[in-house]
């Protein structure tokens, strides 16, 4: 032990191995979702730490906030969050809530539910919340519930992640159970089924093995995170396969 200098913390597990890490402010632990604000800052949600870390566009650490709990700026293993008009909306999955907070983590509004919200997206009028079921809750931006859209189980089973196009009139949902991406048109608080991808569990191009999130580009193409195929697939606005990255 005489070779070990003072003022150094060494972390050992119960077997005596040095397997644990000290996580600094610039590291992220189990990042699950990411979003940007109007200034280009990047917000990263750490799943197990129940925390959001903020970095500037060059990757420099700025701040962090959150924590496990029931407080309005705490959550319990949230699955998805978004930033819309520089307000953060969080699907607090095991807290059974949707929460809105400022870009510095200050409280705004809370909506409570008996379900376990997983997916969240917003347009200029409403916030859409997906659950591990075939229903979508529609809230206003102050998180007052406006409607619940019950979708036929033929089209939707488990909304894990979702996004809305730039026009605010299309909603793309990653359906975890059905291994598909399904798209709906938006009219006010109403959703109408439009189209969906193949729903077989497969590693072939155009198919998914547990999709967990979606995103639109400015041309209306849809990108979906294909979890167990370890890739992102791109479909055009008609949901025809275009390309992929990852394997």
Regions found by a protein language model. Give the residues of each.
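Residue-level detector of Asp-centered blade-edge/turn motifs that repeat once per structural unit
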Residues: 36-38, 83-86, 122-125, 164-168, ...
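Beta-strand-rich domains and repeat architectures in extracellular enzymes and scaffolds
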Residues: 26-38, 42-44
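Gly/Pro-rich loop segments of beta-rich domains
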Residues: 26-30, 60-79, 105-118, 144-160, ...
